[in-house]
Amino acid sequence: MKKVRRLLQWVGMSAIFLASSPFLLLADNDVKVSSETLPGQFAFVQGDFEKFQAHHWIKKNYVGGIENFLGEYNNPNFSTSMDSRAILGNGDYEGVFVMTKGPWFTHFNYEQFRKYYSGRGGVYHRFTRFSGVDLDRELALDIAHIEIETGRKINENGEISFSYEHEFKDGAKSRLTWTPVTEGAVTRGIGPSWQEIDEDVDIFRLKIEDEIKGFTVKGEQSLELFKTKSRRYERSLSTNAGAVLATVNQRRVRIQDQVPEGNLMSSMLELNRWSFNDKVFSALAYRFARLDVRELENLKEFDDLLNPRSLSANSENKFDARSHNNMFTHTWVMSLMTFPWNVVNIGSRFKAELMERKGGSTYPGDFTDPPDNVIDRTEKSSVNNKIKRLGQAVTFRYKGIPRTALYTDFELEEVFNDLTENRTSIGRTPSANEVFFRNTLTPSWRAVGTAGGNFSPWRFLNMTHQFRIRSYNNNYDDRRETSSTGTAARSAFFDELDIRGLEASSRVSLKFCRWFQPSVRHQWRDTKYFTRVENQGEVETGMLSHVYTFDMTLIPRPDIFITGSYSKDQSHTQSERAMSLVPTFNSGVDSWFLSILYMVNEKIHFNGAVLYSHADNFNDFTAIGLPLGADFNRVDVTFGCKWTPRKNFSLGPKYEFYHYGANHKAEYGDYNVNIAGLEASLAWG
């Protein structure tokens, strides 16, 4: 598969450059070409370059290439256009190519980018050795999407097309499954972990659209094939030495291999039409989907010297574990939109969905220390899941009041989930703790109501206000469950979850004059969480947040354009009712931004921007757990100049500076970065 991926990747990048060749060779009035290049950019990094790359998606050292290449060719019988980008060294490639000849058309799209990750774990400032541990490897994931579509216009309103898509992910990323780190008698989950990923997706799609007796008819048939190979690495760390089992367990290594693969087949049919002199729009759609997935998993445990071991009480040596799941869904959607008067718009939508899922798995385990590759016990599981989902929505818009627009929306969803689980334990040493049967009926509902409006009582004043209420309830009802034969007999013990939220936002904009236009915005959210588990009292938790934003546009002279903003984000989280001590958490971030554009003359332009963010949220909860809260200072500065000696040619040197300084009691990874680069653009035709 990697050979196929490399071939498609080569074809995609080659198409970007080859498609540009005709535009460079053709020289007549029908051709328009422009190019913006980055001959060179160099990032000088002092400090944690991995965190810098993860924050800004900019690779250290040198990158360069084509930032944007546009080409267009038109004549009565044939037209083509392209838009491409290729930054070497940063894994950033993009190309869009469109060609039409008569009723035939072809679209080609290629996009690839690289996402960077920091390999640093968490921080516990009371540790002297293993706080903020960093992996000894760089983590980056290349993500790409290739699509080609070709088709033909059937008539003025209809067309048929076939497309092929390929997506892949290749590389490694950090994971938040942080490992246990032990110093003395204290253990905290702050050790870094990472995962290798090799994923391929192929999608084949056939689409047809036409108009039949006033109805627009759309049909689509697709087949998606996917396969992923991943390997997760987790290493526990400890300052305690020795060969005692408990001490060796503190330095264990776990490696997990997972290979899920499957296919998704779906069919969709949609009908819609306008009627009653375009005052009523109605639509009906149906979708059928079938998902079939298989997975192979191996989980192995080692000591710190990578010798195979079975160290933990519930050994994590699982060999050749397999699962097979399939799911069927039927979805119906109906919508109706009416315009009874010019100032009124009423819409409604209804959705019904039936879903059935069946699955089974085997989980073999080797509990001998060291492992002897003989399966001691196998857990066999099966699941049967039936879900019915209904959804309704109503919208109302009114513009009958001068300088005013009012709207309201209401959404409701009901879900009925019937889940049957069955697990048995077989083998040389079966475990009664792993045997259980349960049937659960889980009804849930969700409601969202929104009301708001836009008001302009005077030309210089514009106001927008919105209020929203949310409610969600999930009642877990175990209709039948085997009696507990041990601590692990039940896979879940939740009884109920209830979430209620209120939101409001307001924005006021002033336009007293053209050269100065300020605006103020306030966003408020109050959310309550009510949870209840078996044999325990209800826990109530709440989060209250405020976001204040001030924006400004200033044009003191025709050749100077200034924008600025200030944002203050505050949140407060506390458990008002709980069975144990849960500390209150307060957080806040202040951000300032300023940008300036100065046009000296038609040939010389200067631009600059400054961003400063400050977070002071360190909450020292080390006595009962990990410290919480982001605590940092961040500065981003950009400065550039654009010189246009000729109408179709320009040069632009640029400079950027990035600073990140964290409170080392909460986070590690400071950096200072200086970036210098040169941009050039050329247009002809």
Report residues per predicted region:
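Bacterial N-terminal signal peptides that target proteins for export
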Residues: 2-12
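Gram-negative and organellar
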Residues: 28-34, 41-685
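Bacterial N-terminal signal peptides
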Residues: 11-22
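Sec/Tat signal peptide C-region and signal peptidase I cleavage site
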Residues: 23-27
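Intrinsically disordered, low-complexity repeat segments enriched in small/polar residues
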Residues: 5-6, 19, 647
